[in-house]
Amino acid sequence: MTLLETTDIHQNLLSYDYYKLAANPSFGLERAATLIQQARAQYPNNLLLDDGDLIQGTALGDYQAVVNPVKCASTLAVHKVMNYLKYDAGTIGNHEFNYGLP
C-alpha cells in the first residue's frame, strides 16, 4: 500500500500566482496532479489523502467565499479538481474556518 498525500493547497489549482499575475511553476495542484498520476501508475495499490487547508489563500478562494459565495449544495473549484483526481479521503484544516460556517 502506498500513501499519496497533499496538504495546504489553499486553492492553488494552477501554477499561477494571481496576486503577482505571473506563472509560478513551484506550486499548484496541476503540478501535483502529474506526480499523483505517475505514482499511481507505479504503485497501483494506493490511497490519495489531503491534510486540509484547501479553501483559503488565493483570489479564487476569496471569490467563492465572499464575492460570489458557493451554496452548500454546490461544489468549490478545489473539490471539483479533487474529485477528478479521485482523492480517497481528507481532513479539515484550520483555514477551512477562515470564512466562517454556512
Regions found by a protein language model. Give the residues of each.
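N-terminal catalytic scaffold of extracellular/periplasmic and nuclease hydrolases
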Residues: 1-102
